[in-house]
Amino acid sequence: MSMVYFNIFLAFIVSLVGLLMYRSHLMSSLLCLEGMMLSLFVMMSVTILNNHFTLASMAPIILLVFAACEAALGLSLLVMVSNTYGTDYVQNLNLLQC
């Protein structure tokens, strides 16, 4: 495994650990999800370029489209929760709470 793949995998793991550790705030969870998506994008792009997969060259762009949609929905949810409750705690998203 080359150092490029190792560094990208390490970035994914750091983002995953950040998502697991700082899951109380919605903003930090969204940032960690974006870090995971960015590392997946770079990993896919490097793999496609190194292995000359010309048929799969659209996959990173499709992943970026899904990441942009996820970011837009996450930020709209963050604005809605912060306007309603005044904070960005994830526990405010529980619909069963009275």
From Swiss-Prot:
Subunit comment: Core subunit of respiratory chain NADH dehydrogenase (Complex I) which is composed of 45 different subunits.
Family to which this protein belongs: Belongs to the complex I subunit 4L family.
One Gene Ontology term of the molecular function aspect: NADH dehydrogenase (ubiquinone) activity
Biological process terms in GO annotation: ATP synthesis coupled electron transport
UniProt xrefs under PANTHER family: NADH-UBIQUINONE OXIDOREDUCTASE CHAIN 4L, NADH-UBIQUINONE OXIDOREDUCTASE SUBUNIT ND4L
GO terms under cellular component: mitochondrial inner membrane; respiratory chain complex I
Protein name: NADH-ubiquinone oxidoreductase chain 4L
Residues that span the membrane, as ranges: 1-21, 29-49, 61-81
Keywords linked to the UniProt accession: Electron transport, Membrane, Mitochondrion, Mitochondrion inner membrane, NAD, Respiratory chain, Translocase, Transmembrane, Transmembrane helix, Transport, Ubiquinone
Its biological purpose: Core subunit of the mitochondrial membrane respiratory chain NADH dehydrogenase (Complex I) which catalyzes electron transfer from NADH through the respiratory chain, using ubiquinone as an electron acceptor. Part of the enzyme membrane arm which is embedded in the lipid bilayer and involved in proton translocation.
Cell compartments where the protein resides: Mitochondrion inner membrane
Entries under InterPro entries matching the protein: NADH_UbQ_OxRdtase_chain4L/K, NUOK/Mnh_C1-like
Domain of life: Eukaryota
Catalytic activity, as annotated: a ubiquinone + NADH + 5 H(+)(in) = a ubiquinol + NAD(+) + 4 H(+)(out)
Leading EC class: translocase
Topology term for the membrane: Multi-pass membrane protein
The UniProt record lists the keyword ATP-binding: no
